[in-house]
A protein has these predicted regions:
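N-terminal pre-domain/capping segments
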Residues: 1-91, 97
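Active-site acidic/histidine proton-transfer and metal-coordination neighborhood
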Residues: 74-168
Length: 168
């Protein structure tokens, strides 16, 4: 049986990613790790991470967009930022692949709205479909997982349910 741990669960105050990997290696039954991109990779050499992992394998990477994407990740009205979000997905796929993983999880945390008519729903939904298709075409060997949270970070997520996720 495989047992994976998310990196955030083991990074305590004053610790770093390498400390968390060590803690996971010492956890009986742990077989796989799940990283957030870019936060768990930034500032580290991949060879350093591979060495720290030892026998542990990578299940996948979850892409996490942060503060400068507050107006949208894959739906950002600033096309440069939107393209940066898509590029981050591709980078996560490359690193996941290099570390032996096979799943990219996308939480569209900022793709949604806080009040009615804040966005052009049809246009933004089309943007999400096109962006995910671009990532899927780029990483054909990867599984793409959509993590939806109906009311996070926005009051209303654009992709807010299993049904909407399947509709993509």
């Amino acid at each position: 049986m495989n047992y994976a741990g998310r990196m955030n669960s083991f990074i305590f105050k004053g610790q770093n990613v390498l400390d968390a990997i060590k803690a996971y290696r010492e956890t009986k039954g742990m077989t796989h790790l799940e990283f957030n991109y870019p936060e768990h990779i930034a500032g580290y050499d991949l060879e350093e991470i591979k060495k720290a992992m030892g026998d542990l394998k990578v299940n996948g990477f979850a892409v996490r967009w942060r503060n400068f994407f507050l107006n949208g990740d894959l739906t950002n009205p600033d096309e440069e930022l939107r393209q940066k979000a898509i590029t981050m997905c591709k980078e996560a796929a490359d690193i996941c692949r290099e570390l032996g993983g096979s799943v990219i999880t996308l939480w569209l945390e900022n793709d949604g709205f806080d009040y009615p008519f804040q966005m052009d729903y049809e246009y933004c939904f089309k943007q999400v479909v096109e962006a995910i298709q671009e990532v899927a075409d780029y990483a054909k060997d990867m599984k793409i997982s959509i993590e939806y949270k109906p009311y996070e970070e926005r009051n209303f997520a654009l992709i807010d349910s299993t049904g909407m996720t399947m509709y993509l």
